[in-house]
Amino acid sequence: MPEGPEIRRAADNLEAAIKGKPLTDVWFAFPQLKTYQSQLIGQHVTHVETRGKALLTHFSNDLTLYSHNQLYGVWRVVDTGEEPQTTRVLRVKLQTADKTILLYSASDIEMLRPEQLTTHPFLQRVGPDVLDPNLTPEVVKERLLSPRFRNRQFAGLLLDQAFLAGLGNYLRVEILWQVGLTGNHKAKDLNAAQLDALAHALLEIPRFSYATRGQVDENKHHGALFRFKVFHRDGEPCERCGSIIEKTTLSSRPFYWCPGCQH
């Protein structure tokens, strides 16, 4: 499943394609959304927002399209008139004079009015977004030490969107390696230095991934500016201590870690 950085980059691409342009055609696959098609013709997308792994497409008439890609959903940007060759099932089409955005395969799609943005079950439950520039390490530390989260193992906590939105498995793995902790640790058992390091890593690593993953530094042998230190690297030596990276399963997801420096 795409994690926060990937969802945010998708939102950036959608915004760049159609933001501010009048919609010339709108189509929804689901019957409950059909009535909104005519309401959106002539309107425009004002901005595309992310809340963790959910995407909110805001329109100029105050409607908002909520979509969650889950495992299979994917957005595509095409030139208007182009019909991609794909076996995926089209769910949403938002067309302007020159660009069209298409949502395939997703099933969690709703149209929301302004008052519903605060009452929608997922949006109401989700925690602060790690890519929100206003979210600080101090706030993250407060959440880590709150009665709700302080006694939970990181294996599950770092996948819980109610704790921090936008984290997922590769970020969980990379963050815990960065701070030298395991999935079995809990916030209540950490010292001040460990808490501080974790609070910073929970924001810095997702933001670095968003800003640089997929970009290339030609002066570096490994190429990509963001690269995995342990994720999908079982059997390889840890670059920090030289021990062999291992793979196990935690909270029903693959977990990669270094037994030499994560303890």
From Swiss-Prot:
Pfam families xrefs: Fapy_DNA_glyco (PF01149), H2TH (PF06831), zf-FPG_IleRS (PF06827)
CDD domains: EcNei-like_N
Catalytic activity: 2'-deoxyribonucleotide-(2'-deoxyribose 5'-phosphate)-2'-deoxyribonucleotide-DNA = a 3'-end 2'-deoxyribonucleotide-(2,3-dehydro-2,3-deoxyribose 5'-phosphate)-DNA + a 5'-end 5'-phospho-2'-deoxyribonucleoside-DNA + H(+)
Coiled-coil stretches: none
Record-linked InterPro entries: DNA_glyclase/AP_lyase_DNA-bd, DNA_glyclase_Znf_dom_DNA_BS, EcNei-like_N, Endonuclease-VIII, FPG_cat, MutM-like_N-ter, Ribosomal_uS13-like_H2TH, Znf_DNA_glyclase/AP_lyase
Start and end residues, zinc fingers (FPG-type): 229-263
Cofactor (UniProt): Zn(2+)
Source domain of life: Bacteria
Keywords: DNA damage, DNA repair, DNA-binding, Glycosidase, Hydrolase, Lyase, Metal-binding, Multifunctional enzyme, Zinc, Zinc-finger
UniProt-listed SMART domains: Fapy_DNA_glyco, H2TH
GO MF, one annotated term: zinc ion binding
GO biological process, one term: base-excision repair
Residues forming the catalytic site: 2 (schiff-base intermediate with dna), 3 (proton donor), 53 (proton donor), 253 (proton donor)
Cofactor note: Binds 1 zinc ion per subunit.
Binding site for DNA: 70, 125, 169
Cited HAMAP family: Endonuclease_8
Recorded family membership: Belongs to the FPG family.
Function: Involved in base excision repair of DNA damaged by oxidation or by mutagenic agents. Acts as a DNA glycosylase that recognizes and removes damaged bases. Has a preference for oxidized pyrimidines, such as thymine glycol, 5,6-dihydrouracil and 5,6-dihydrothymine. Has AP (apurinic/apyrimidinic) lyase activity and introduces nicks in the DNA strand. Cleaves the DNA backbone by beta-delta elimination to generate a single-strand break at the site of the removed base with both 3'- and 5'-phosphates.
NCBIfam families reported in the protein's UniProt record: PRK10445.1
Protein name, entry field: Endonuclease 8
Organism: Escherichia coli O9:H4 (strain HS)
Gene (name only): nei
